[in-house]
Every structure is written in C-alpha cells, then in structure tokens.
Amino acid sequence: MFESKYDVIVVGGGHAGAEAAAASANLGAKTLLVTMNLQTIGQMSCNPAMGGIAKGQIVREIDALGGYSGVVSDLTAIQFKMLNKSKGPAMWSPRVQSDRAQFALKWREMLEKTPNLDFYQDMVVGLIVKNNKINGVKTGLGNNIFSKTVILTNGTFLNGLIHVGEKNFGGGRVGEKSSTGITSDLESYGFVSGRMKTGTPPRVDGLSLIHI
C-alpha cells in the first residue's frame, strides 16, 4: 500500500521512468512510481533493442552512473553487435537485441528489489501546485498523493493517437489507452504542447511481391 507523502513521485513506467525511479530510490529518497499498467513497466514498444548509434553511448553512461538499463539488457540479450565497425573506433556503437518479454520482466524484478521504492497503478491527471510549487499529483481514481518533487516521464502516452491507414484512435501504445488530463493541466500553468509522430512501416518480404 502506498503512503500519502513521498520525496519523489515518478509518473510513467517506461525506460526513462524506471531509471528515474531507481536512481531516486537508490539515493535514499522515498519514491513512488505511478504507471497506468504495472505489467508493462520497462516494456520495449517497438524494436526490442537497446543501444545503437549514439544511444549505445548513452546506455554506457547510464551504466557507469549505476543505472539498470545495461544490466537488464545483458541479462535478457539474444544478440550483441558493434555497429559502424567499418569506421574509426570513435564511431563504434554497441547494440543489444533482447527478449522483449524477459526484458520487461527483469526490469520489474530489479525495481521490486530496490529499497525505498513503492508502486501504484493509476493515471495521473494533474499536478498539485501550491504557491507556485509542486506538492504532488492528482490521479484518475481521485487520489491526491503528495511529494516534494514530481518527475514526468510520460513518453508517447500524453493524449496519444494511433494511426492505422486512414483510421486513428486514442492510445499510447497498441492495446493501451492514452493518458488524458495531464496535458491540459500543464497547459493551464503556461506550458505549450505540440505533437510529434513516429512510424513503424510494414515489414514486407520482397520475394513475396509479384511484379506485373
């Protein structure tokens, strides 16, 4: 059962949120990770890989600072590859392909073993602000949870839309609902929101195509 007052509340349980929660808790702060689905903490949304050009260096830096991403990647790896080997060493970038299901499972397992860290499944719909200072979050189930600091790691879920062909519908990821409420709340405090798009093209076997 979560408590009503924390040092840090992390909103969102993706890779950024999981790392933020682990870092906060390991530094001794009483931390709460709030996510809409506890079963998808640390889940790989698309390509089940960590690292790559530029990103591989970031994962190594996180690892050097005591983060979990590199450890989880190693424990769930099915392939390691150094990219750009045809170029100079400064251009080399490590990448690991992981078992998607095991990756999320291992992330959750490591977080559950982290001291000072609690979990709560709910949607954050707004911030609690008093005298221009963050005091906590409001949730979709009507709970007010108080904290000294709030870290937002919402990923693609804020008012998320999924487009399939000419159709579109709300969702932060296929099969998961989008996060609503917090965007308009942030806008009421003067933040400006925009929309970015990412796409996953279909994988088609060229040998299956018939040329007419």
Residue ranges and their predicted role:
Residues D7, N135, K148:
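Conserved acidic residues
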Residues V11, I145-G155:
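Short hydrophobic core segments
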Residues V137-T139:
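SH3/SH3-like beta-barrel fold
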Residues E3-A16:
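Beta1/beta-strand and adjacent pyrophosphate-binding region of the FAD-binding site
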Residues K5, A22-K130, L141, T153-R173, ...:
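Conserved N-terminal/central alpha/beta ligand/cofactor-binding core
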Residues E19:
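N-terminal, positively charged regions that mediate nucleic acid binding
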